[in-house]
Amino acid sequence: MAFLLITRRLACSSQKNLHLFIPGSRYISQAAAKVDIEFDYDGPLMKTEVPGPRSKELMKQLNTIQNAEAVHFFCNYEESRGNYLVDVDGNRMLDLYSQISSVPIGYNHPALAKLVQQPQNASTFINRPALGILPPENFVDKLQESLMSVAPRGMSQLITMACGSCSNENAFKTIFMWYRSKERGQRGFSKEELETCMVNQSPGCPDYSILSFMGAFHGRTMGCLATTHSKAIHKIDIPSFDWPIAPFPRLKYPLEEFTTDNQQEEARCLEEVEDLIVKYRKKKRTVAGIIVEPIQSEGGDNHASDDFFRKLRDIARKHGCAFLVDEVQTGGGCTGKFWAHEHWGLDDPADVMTFSKKMMTGGFFHKEEFRPSAPYRIFNTWLGDPSKNLLLAEVINIIKREDLLNNVARVGKTLLTGLLDLQAQYPQFISRVRGRGTFCSFDTPDEAIRNKLILIARNKGVVLGGCGDKSIRFRPTLVFRDHHAHLFLSIFSGILADFK
């Protein structure tokens, strides 16, 4: 019934709200509020502060059964559409955060609503199988239509999961098994290995490690948390492993003015990576793999050059380490290529690549040589969700049909240019503007100013996200257009002009 209601509302989308006033903000012209996708609104519409009274009441109720302090507001997903998120108090906001970068083609896309209503798809949404032992007849076909159609170069193997953390966690396990298999050679498991692994001892449980970078975020499960170094609150009180942590480059901006400094900074970090690999080998805690994000997201939208990643890949190969690229947040098209690591121009592809968020399901691609040697070694009950593969196949069709990767590249230039203009106009509030595609960000003077700007923007009808200590990040959908960027820039310019 909910999807029928959504479809009826989408059919009435031509009845637009033509007056766009945001309390306390400048008037936004109708040209800026142009609608060019059939299921979008024409602009923000604010009725209360956010969170409003209904959200506050629901937050209070939720807090009686769990800690709800992280909740921003409650949403009305039936009324949300396109690039606009509607809350339970009727506030309609331009969403440039898109559920922490996880909404690919906007809210309630008509094609997805239609897909859900088709009778032949009902059983896929009703029945969630244990895919590792009882997959449905069309499972292989749907994987080919969805995930395998966008498989990264050099990776023919795929394992689906439910989220980003379990994707990275199982990718680590895959790397450890691969590395031990190389050491073991052709022989099978020894009696000693089989016995000692049951009591968490060597040689059955070898003391391998994964090298990660300071500022990284790879998830919150035990193995992933050992490679996550973005915020202390994620890690405090949780036992962890002695695994190596390398510095990630801290680039100076504008890039063209600091070429030499940035090259030296990247060289310093790469040298430290090699030193740590050698150090941990001597400690008998061999680095089996290196994990890196194409852009450190939660840690502050930290970038490095394509050359840095090419050299990092060379170091991994030189020392026999697996090279794992975490595309959980950067994957799915938001940098202007389907996978952000495609920008690097690697001669030798990465060994393993994890994904989630905009891909609507989790999992990882890997090279043939990383294939598990026996069943149940990489396994859980669900191993993903076929209904998400069904939706993803249609999302990928829309990305191709509407040329959304080029849209992201084009609109990203509009957004980045506008942010640079605001930086020139308000250098006291904005610095280090950076981005790739619409995956953009900038720094503010401190955390307090950053948080205040995000709250003011929300009450003006724009949802933004924070990251790192003092950065604001942009994570719009792939159907974010030029006029959405201009609309945001107009609103945010007014905020900065009045900011105290």
Swiss-Prot record:
Keyword Signal: no
PROSITE patterns referenced in this protein's UniProt entry, alphabetically: AA_TRANSFER_CLASS_3
A molecular function (GO) term: succinate-semialdehyde dehydrogenase binding
Binding-site residues, substrate: R220
Alphabetized UniProt keyword annotations: Acetylation, Aminotransferase, Disulfide bond, Iron, Iron-sulfur, Metal-binding, Mitochondrion, Neurotransmitter degradation, Pyridoxal phosphate, Transferase, Transit peptide
Binding positions for pyridoxal 5'-phosphate per the UniProt entry: G164, S165, T381
Enzyme class: transferase
Quaternary data: Homodimer; disulfide-linked.
Family: Belongs to the class-III pyridoxal-phosphate-dependent aminotransferase family.
Name assigned to this protein: 4-aminobutyrate aminotransferase, mitochondrial
